[in-house]
């Protein structure tokens, strides 16, 4: 937890917050802080700054906060990802938030197991929890947008063209693929398939709306590794 995220209900006055639960436990056990110490804090979807500890005990943490810093800008990248298995989804959500991706779309595919869509990890609360962990790691306050698309063909034909406007668009797939570009600075969209990849029909449909196939290398990667490699290549170094 490199940043303590503050939510509206934490504020007891304009510049004062009271924290309990996980954040209190982290400050006690990891930071081992004391009254008079300062901690890095940020208001969710707002400014960042410091929090001066004015009270700290087993029941609560009270901070006087000074929020003056703008959070780091999001990368103008949309990741369209075939819904992975739930345990992998948790890690990918954290990664997306940590790396500053603007938007994540979780989409269905022929090789996505139907049971994945009934997972409790797809609830709004569960998704938000993992995104918060990613923001805490990166020292960011702004949540990425996450949307679900349970029907592949309607998403590609009706929704995807609008997302592609003004963006370079890539499909991570080895068929007739060029090398994945690196350190891109403009708006982009990248599509990554499920374990086993998209079926030929899905690849053709994605190509028909303007996606260019790119290769992430000769090795067969797990989905979360493919996400890390693709974003690592596409996002600018600075």
Model-based region annotation:
Residues 70-168:
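RNA substrate-binding interface of SAM-dependent RNA methyltransferases
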Residues 27, 89-92, 202:
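Hydrophobic side chains in well-ordered alpha-helices
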Residues 43, 108-109, 173-176, 194, ...:
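Short secondary-structure boundary segments
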Residues 160-203, 211-214:
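Active-site/ligand-binding-proximal alpha/beta "capping" segment
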Residues 1-69:
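N-terminal positively charged helical leader segments and presequences
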Residues 200-238:
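Structured adenosyl-cofactor binding patch, chiefly the S-adenosyl-L-methionine
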Residues 9, 68, 108-111, 218:
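Short, ordered loop/turn segments at secondary-structure junctions
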